[in-house]
Amino acid sequence: MAKQVRKASKKTKLKVPSGVAHVQATFNNTIITITNPAGDVLAWCSAGASGFKGARKSTPFAAKIAAETAARKSMDYGLRQISVIIKGAGSGRESAIRGLSEAGLEIKLLRDITSIPHNGCRPPKKRRV
């Protein structure tokens, strides 16, 4: 008769005291990814994943709600302090940072790594409304 082998749970909750929040703010959406210092993803959320669709995804309010949701998910791992890396020129930049701090995370560092073209691709044409 075969022996019963007891399987241990492979997934264990990590305890990460500090991490990195990557905020990518585009003109259409805001994506917040929270990682540990090594770069492994702990939690993520976007304005679209928070329930906003269409033009409402690009609002600062949607970015704040997405940041608060990502922060709450990451606090399950014991996260308390974060460094924030911001990329992009969207409207949800500042409100995403405000949402992270209001959720209870202490912000240690702010870095802006928005790329600036040295006359690279042609930008989109100006809107005529």
Swiss-Prot record:
It is found in: Plastid, Chloroplast. Keywords: Chloroplast, Plastid, Ribonucleoprotein, Ribosomal protein, RNA-binding, rRNA-binding. GO terms for molecular function: rRNA binding; structural constituent of ribosome. InterPro entries: Ribosomal_uS11, Ribosomal_uS11_bac-type, Ribosomal_uS11_CS, Ribosomal_uS11_sf. It holds the Pfam family Ribosomal_S11. GO terms for cellular component: chloroplast; ribonucleoprotein complex; ribosome. GO terms for biological process: translation. Belongs to the universal ribosomal protein uS11 family. Part of the 30S ribosomal subunit. NCBIfam families: PRK05309.1, uS11_bact. This is Small ribosomal subunit protein uS11c. It comes from Oltmannsiellopsis viridis (Marine flagellate). The gene is rps11.
